[in-house]
Amino acid sequence: LGNRQMTITVNREYNVHYNKKRIRRLMQILCLKSVCRKKRYNYIKSTPEVTAKNILNRDFHADKSNEKWLTDVTEFKYYVGTEVRKIYLSAILDLYDRRIVSYKIGGSNNNPLVFDTFDEAVKANPDAHPLFHSDRGFQYTSKIFHNKLIAANMRQSMSRVGRCIDNGPMEGFWGILKSEMYYLRKFTSRDDLISAIKRYLHFYNNKRYQQRLNCMTPMEFHRAAA
Protein backbone atom coordinates (compact mmCIF):
# COMPACT_ATOMS: atom_id res chain seq x y z
CA LEU A 1 0.00 0.00 0.00
CA GLY A 2 1.11 3.56 -0.66
CA ASN A 3 1.09 6.15 2.12
CA ARG A 4 -2.34 7.52 1.14
CA GLN A 5 -4.01 4.12 1.14
CA MET A 6 -2.17 3.15 4.33
CA THR A 7 -3.41 6.32 6.05
CA ILE A 8 -7.03 5.59 5.18
CA THR A 9 -6.72 1.95 6.26
CA VAL A 10 -5.04 2.70 9.61
CA ASN A 11 -7.54 5.44 10.46
CA ARG A 12 -10.56 3.29 9.59
CA GLU A 13 -9.36 0.05 11.18
CA TYR A 14 -8.12 1.59 14.44
CA ASN A 15 -10.48 4.58 14.70
CA VAL A 16 -7.64 7.10 14.81
CA HIS A 17 -6.91 10.31 12.91
CA TYR A 18 -3.31 10.25 11.72
CA ASN A 19 -2.39 12.49 8.80
CA LYS A 20 -0.66 11.30 5.64
CA LYS A 21 2.67 12.93 6.54
CA ARG A 22 2.93 10.99 9.79
CA ILE A 23 2.09 7.70 8.09
CA ARG A 24 4.60 8.41 5.32
CA ARG A 25 7.30 9.13 7.89
CA LEU A 26 6.54 5.90 9.77
CA MET A 27 6.58 3.92 6.53
CA GLN A 28 9.99 5.36 5.70
CA ILE A 29 11.31 4.40 9.14
CA LEU A 30 9.96 0.86 8.70
CA CYS A 31 11.20 0.68 5.08
CA LEU A 32 7.67 0.03 3.79
CA LYS A 33 7.23 0.83 0.11
CA SER A 34 4.43 0.31 -2.37
CA VAL A 35 5.03 -1.81 -5.46
CA CYS A 36 5.39 0.04 -8.76
CA ARG A 37 2.86 -0.82 -11.43
CA LYS A 38 4.02 -2.33 -14.69
CA LYS A 39 2.78 -1.42 -18.14
CA ARG A 40 0.36 -4.00 -19.51
CA TYR A 41 0.59 -5.57 -22.94
CA ASN A 42 -2.31 -7.86 -23.79
CA TYR A 43 -3.30 -7.57 -27.42
CA ILE A 44 -5.02 -10.12 -29.67
CA LYS A 45 -5.56 -8.91 -33.23
CA SER A 46 -8.92 -9.65 -34.80
CA THR A 47 -11.36 -8.37 -37.38
CA PRO A 48 -14.31 -6.78 -35.55
CA GLU A 49 -17.84 -7.85 -36.42
CA VAL A 50 -19.36 -4.94 -34.50
CA THR A 51 -17.88 -1.63 -33.39
CA ALA A 52 -19.32 1.17 -31.27
CA LYS A 53 -18.55 4.83 -30.71
CA ASN A 54 -16.71 6.00 -27.62
CA ILE A 55 -19.91 7.21 -25.94
CA LEU A 56 -18.25 7.24 -22.51
CA ASN A 57 -15.67 9.70 -23.88
CA ARG A 58 -13.61 9.59 -20.67
CA ASP A 59 -16.51 10.83 -18.56
CA PHE A 60 -15.68 8.64 -15.59
CA HIS A 61 -18.21 10.29 -13.26
CA ALA A 62 -21.43 8.46 -12.41
CA ASP A 63 -24.35 9.76 -10.35
CA LYS A 64 -25.70 6.39 -9.31
CA SER A 65 -24.92 2.71 -9.13
CA ASN A 66 -25.28 0.69 -12.35
CA GLU A 67 -25.14 3.80 -14.51
CA LYS A 68 -21.81 2.99 -16.17
CA TRP A 69 -19.94 -0.32 -16.27
CA LEU A 70 -16.41 -0.85 -17.53
CA THR A 71 -14.91 -4.20 -18.45
CA ASP A 72 -11.65 -5.78 -19.57
CA VAL A 73 -9.53 -8.94 -19.43
CA THR A 74 -6.04 -9.22 -17.97
CA GLU A 75 -3.53 -12.06 -17.70
CA PHE A 76 -1.52 -13.57 -14.85
CA LYS A 77 1.51 -15.84 -15.12
CA TYR A 78 2.53 -18.72 -12.91
CA TYR A 79 5.48 -21.07 -13.15
CA VAL A 80 5.73 -24.85 -13.25
CA GLY A 81 9.45 -25.51 -13.17
CA THR A 82 10.85 -23.47 -16.04
CA GLU A 83 7.53 -23.45 -17.90
CA VAL A 84 5.44 -20.27 -17.89
CA ARG A 85 1.67 -20.73 -17.86
CA LYS A 86 -1.16 -18.21 -17.85
CA ILE A 87 -4.65 -17.66 -16.54
CA TYR A 88 -7.01 -14.82 -17.40
CA LEU A 89 -9.31 -12.64 -15.32
CA SER A 90 -12.35 -10.95 -16.83
CA ALA A 91 -14.11 -8.37 -14.66
CA ILE A 92 -16.79 -5.69 -14.74
CA LEU A 93 -16.35 -2.51 -12.67
CA ASP A 94 -19.08 -0.04 -11.68
CA LEU A 95 -17.94 3.55 -12.11
CA TYR A 96 -20.12 4.94 -9.30
CA ASP A 97 -18.99 2.83 -6.36
CA ARG A 98 -15.94 1.22 -8.02
CA ARG A 99 -17.11 -2.23 -6.98
CA ILE A 100 -16.34 -5.31 -9.02
CA VAL A 101 -19.80 -6.31 -10.23
CA SER A 102 -18.74 -9.74 -11.47
CA TYR A 103 -15.66 -11.65 -12.55
CA LYS A 104 -14.54 -14.94 -14.05
CA ILE A 105 -11.16 -16.67 -14.11
CA GLY A 106 -10.18 -19.07 -16.89
CA GLY A 107 -7.32 -20.73 -18.69
CA SER A 108 -8.07 -19.04 -22.02
CA ASN A 109 -8.81 -15.50 -23.09
CA ASN A 110 -11.87 -16.50 -25.07
CA ASN A 111 -15.54 -15.71 -25.63
CA PRO A 112 -16.94 -17.89 -22.80
CA LEU A 113 -14.74 -16.08 -20.27
CA VAL A 114 -16.20 -12.69 -21.21
CA PHE A 115 -19.74 -13.90 -21.89
CA ASP A 116 -19.96 -15.69 -18.52
CA THR A 117 -18.72 -12.55 -16.74
CA PHE A 118 -21.44 -10.52 -18.40
CA ASP A 119 -24.15 -13.11 -17.75
CA GLU A 120 -23.26 -13.21 -14.06
CA ALA A 121 -23.46 -9.41 -13.80
CA VAL A 122 -26.87 -9.35 -15.47
CA LYS A 123 -28.17 -12.17 -13.28
CA ALA A 124 -27.05 -10.36 -10.11
CA ASN A 125 -28.41 -7.00 -11.32
CA PRO A 126 -31.51 -7.76 -13.42
CA ASP A 127 -32.77 -4.17 -13.30
CA ALA A 128 -29.46 -2.63 -14.36
CA HIS A 129 -29.20 -1.07 -17.82
CA PRO A 130 -25.86 0.76 -17.74
CA LEU A 131 -23.72 2.19 -20.46
CA PHE A 132 -21.32 -0.70 -21.08
CA HIS A 133 -17.77 0.33 -22.03
CA SER A 134 -14.88 -1.86 -23.17
CA ASP A 135 -11.87 -1.81 -25.43
CA ARG A 136 -12.07 -3.32 -28.92
CA GLY A 137 -11.10 -6.84 -27.89
CA PHE A 138 -12.45 -9.58 -30.13
CA GLN A 139 -14.99 -10.74 -27.54
CA TYR A 140 -16.59 -7.31 -27.25
CA THR A 141 -16.73 -6.76 -31.03
CA SER A 142 -18.51 -10.06 -31.70
CA LYS A 143 -22.13 -10.16 -32.86
CA ILE A 144 -23.00 -12.58 -30.06
CA PHE A 145 -21.85 -10.16 -27.38
CA HIS A 146 -23.54 -7.24 -29.11
CA ASN A 147 -26.81 -9.18 -29.06
CA LYS A 148 -26.35 -9.87 -25.34
CA LEU A 149 -26.14 -6.14 -24.72
CA ILE A 150 -29.26 -5.50 -26.78
CA ALA A 151 -31.15 -8.20 -24.87
CA ALA A 152 -30.10 -6.59 -21.58
CA ASN A 153 -31.10 -3.13 -22.84
CA MET A 154 -27.59 -1.72 -22.52
CA ARG A 155 -25.81 0.77 -24.77
CA GLN A 156 -22.39 -0.24 -26.01
CA SER A 157 -19.38 2.07 -25.86
CA MET A 158 -15.83 1.26 -26.99
CA SER A 159 -12.44 2.84 -26.52
CA ARG A 160 -10.76 4.26 -29.58
CA VAL A 161 -8.08 2.15 -31.24
CA GLY A 162 -4.87 2.23 -29.21
CA ARG A 163 -6.30 4.54 -26.52
CA CYS A 164 -6.20 2.52 -23.30
CA ILE A 165 -6.81 5.71 -21.31
CA ASP A 166 -10.38 5.67 -22.67
CA ASN A 167 -10.89 2.78 -20.24
CA GLY A 168 -8.74 4.41 -17.57
CA PRO A 169 -10.46 3.33 -14.32
CA MET A 170 -10.49 -0.29 -15.45
CA GLU A 171 -6.80 -0.14 -16.31
CA GLY A 172 -6.24 1.54 -12.96
CA PHE A 173 -7.97 -1.29 -11.15
CA TRP A 174 -5.71 -3.86 -12.84
CA GLY A 175 -2.73 -1.85 -11.65
CA ILE A 176 -4.00 -1.78 -8.07
CA LEU A 177 -4.75 -5.50 -8.03
CA LYS A 178 -1.39 -6.52 -9.45
CA SER A 179 0.74 -4.13 -7.41
CA GLU A 180 -0.94 -5.10 -4.13
CA MET A 181 -1.30 -8.85 -4.71
CA TYR A 182 0.39 -10.26 -7.80
CA TYR A 183 3.79 -8.55 -8.06
CA LEU A 184 4.58 -9.29 -4.43
CA ARG A 185 5.33 -12.95 -5.04
CA LYS A 186 6.13 -15.57 -7.67
CA PHE A 187 3.30 -18.06 -8.09
CA THR A 188 4.17 -21.69 -8.80
CA SER A 189 0.67 -23.15 -8.56
CA ARG A 190 -2.43 -22.41 -10.62
CA ASP A 191 -4.69 -23.09 -7.64
CA ASP A 192 -2.68 -20.78 -5.38
CA LEU A 193 -2.84 -17.98 -7.94
CA ILE A 194 -6.59 -18.36 -8.44
CA SER A 195 -7.16 -18.41 -4.67
CA ALA A 196 -5.04 -15.27 -4.25
CA ILE A 197 -7.02 -13.45 -6.94
CA LYS A 198 -10.35 -14.42 -5.37
CA ARG A 199 -9.19 -13.35 -1.91
CA TYR A 200 -8.01 -10.01 -3.22
CA LEU A 201 -11.24 -9.31 -5.09
CA HIS A 202 -13.19 -9.98 -1.90
CA PHE A 203 -10.79 -7.73 0.01
CA TYR A 204 -11.07 -4.99 -2.62
CA ASN A 205 -14.87 -4.92 -2.58
CA ASN A 206 -15.31 -5.29 1.17
CA LYS A 207 -12.16 -4.17 2.99
CA ARG A 208 -10.17 -1.75 0.82
CA TYR A 209 -11.07 1.83 1.73
CA GLN A 210 -10.97 4.47 -1.01
CA GLN A 211 -10.57 8.19 -0.56
CA ARG A 212 -12.84 8.93 -3.54
CA LEU A 213 -15.58 6.94 -1.79
CA ASN A 214 -15.43 9.06 1.38
CA CYS A 215 -12.98 6.55 2.85
CA MET A 216 -15.50 3.72 2.49
CA THR A 217 -15.12 0.41 0.72
CA PRO A 218 -16.88 -0.12 -2.63
CA MET A 219 -19.59 -2.26 -1.03
CA GLU A 220 -20.07 0.17 1.87
CA PHE A 221 -20.53 3.00 -0.62
CA HIS A 222 -22.84 0.85 -2.74
CA ARG A 223 -25.06 -0.03 0.22
CA ALA A 224 -25.09 3.56 1.52
CA ALA A 225 -26.46 4.75 -1.82
CA ALA A 226 -29.09 2.03 -2.08
What are these regions (language model features)?
Residues 1-64, 163, 217-226:
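Basic, flexible linker segments flanking DNA-binding modules
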Residues 97-103, 156-159, 183-184:
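Short small-residue beta-strand/loop micro-motif enriched in glycine and branched aliphatics
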Residues 143, 150-154, 176-226:
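C-terminal domain-tail junction helix/linker
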